């Protein structure tokens, strides 16, 4: 299949995918277009520009938009080089085309970072590709037809290499700008949370410096995973804003806790003393309930005093140690040893004791 037929097929498939909103399959088609040599005749006689522009306009993926925009910028630079100076040698044409392409991509990056008016630039880019005069249709054969297929492939490879470097540079620049803004916002959130309960305005600079130090330590811990970094920031802010965790601010002011220690603290470490005691009681109760049998039929007695409610209304039985789920510090070598097991009928308290004989 010739390059023209491949371009027509790719353009038609891209338009179908955009119409059906199957955006996950468009990336492969754009990659194939990058590997195919596209001449000025192809830009004139096919709808590839319109198809790529539809991706740029309708696709929600930022990666696909950048790839489509780089393709359009490359084609515009190629069209300008062949349209304005068609009689130059292949080497000069290759150099000028790369310069035009680099200037176009650099202009796109500067416009994205400063004004954000990429829509008008994209419209101009597509119009420059599609606005071809009738007499230009007869010139490409004289301008490019004298070049060998090897020279054409070298030009195409030069475009791809230059385009990849410019796109990588653009992506890294945009990512760095976004990361700086995210980190600044996180410092602001930490400062607001730290100073939420502060009434003394003289301590404002203390909280500002502390917020910066905390953010730097958190970023150092999770610099390779931005999701974990954001999750840690949200956790720290929520715990600092919790009125029950006022001990965190007090520890900062007293110097008992540093910014690095706070950045490395887990959710359990940041909890208040009341919550820690509640968790410990729940854990102890759960372990005790898990160790004891679920239902035991025993003998009622009023000779045993409940250790919780101090009432004499209990039910007692004897069971084998091997039937209980006991921790290692309670177990011994004899699973058949009998244990006295007591249930309070008033409050439901349950407990057991080894070698205990009830009167």
UniProtKB/Swiss-Prot annotation:
SUPFAM superfamilies: Conserved domain common to transcription factors TFIIS, elongin A, CRSP70 (SSF47676), Elongation factor TFIIS domain 2 (SSF46942). Residues 84-118 are annotated as: Disordered. It holds the Pfam family TFIIS_M. Residues 104-118 have a biased composition (Polar residues). One of its GO terms (biological process) is DNA-templated transcription. Residues 182-298 form the TFIIS central domain. Residues 1-82 form the TFIIS N-terminal domain. PANTHER family: TRANSCRIPTION ELONGATION FACTOR A N-TERMINAL AND CENTRAL DOMAIN-CONTAINING PROTEIN, TRANSCRIPTION FACTOR S-II ZINC FINGER DOMAIN-CONTAINING PROTEIN. This is Transcription elongation factor A N-terminal and central domain-containing protein. It comes from Mus musculus.
């Amino acid at each position: 299949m010739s390059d023209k037929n491949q371009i027509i097929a790719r353009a038609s498939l891209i338009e179908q995918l955009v119409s059906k909103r199957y955006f996950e399959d468009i990336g492969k088609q754009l990659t194939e277009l990058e590997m195919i040599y596209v001449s000025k005749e192809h830009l004139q006689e096919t709808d590839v520009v319109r198809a790529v522009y539809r991706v740029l306009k309708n696709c929600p993926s930022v990666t696909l938009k950048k790839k489509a925009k780089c393709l359009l910028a490359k084609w515009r630079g190629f069209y300008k080089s062949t349209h304005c100076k068609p009689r130059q040698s292949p080497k000069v044409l290759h150099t000028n085309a790369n310069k035009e392409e680099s200037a176009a991509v650099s202009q796109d990056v500067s416009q994205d970072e400063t004004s954000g008016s990429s829509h008008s630039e994209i419209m101009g880019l597509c119009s420059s590709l599609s606005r071809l005069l009738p007499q230009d249709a007869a010139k490409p054969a004289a301008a490019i037809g004298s070049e060998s297929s090897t020279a054409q492939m070298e030009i195409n490879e030069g475009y791809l290499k230059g385009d990849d470097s410019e796109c990588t540079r653009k992506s890294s620049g945009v990512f760095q700008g976004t990361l700086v803004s995210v980190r600044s916002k996180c410092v602001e959130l930490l400062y607001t949370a730290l100073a939420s309960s502060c009434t003394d305005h003289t301590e404002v600079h203390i909280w500002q410096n502390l917020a910066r130090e905390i953010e730097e330590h958190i970023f150092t811990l999770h610099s390779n995973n931005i999701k974990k970094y954001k999750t840690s920031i949200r956790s720290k802010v929520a715990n600092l804003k919790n009125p029950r965790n006022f001990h965190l601010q007090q520890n900062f002011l007293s110097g008992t806790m540093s910014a690095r220690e706070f950045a490395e603290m887990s959710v359990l470490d940041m909890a208040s003393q009341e919550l820690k005691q509640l968790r410990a009681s729940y854990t102890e109760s759960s372990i005790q309930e898990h160790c004891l049998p679920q239902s035991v039929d025993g003998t009622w007695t009023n000779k045993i005093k409940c250790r919780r409610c101090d009432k004499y209304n209990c039910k007692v039985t004897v069971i084998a140690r091997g039937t209980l789920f006991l921790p290692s510090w309670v177990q011994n070598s004899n699973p058949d040893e009998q244990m006295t097991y007591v249930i309070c009928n008033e409050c439901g308290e349950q407990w057991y004791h080894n070698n205990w004989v009830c009167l």
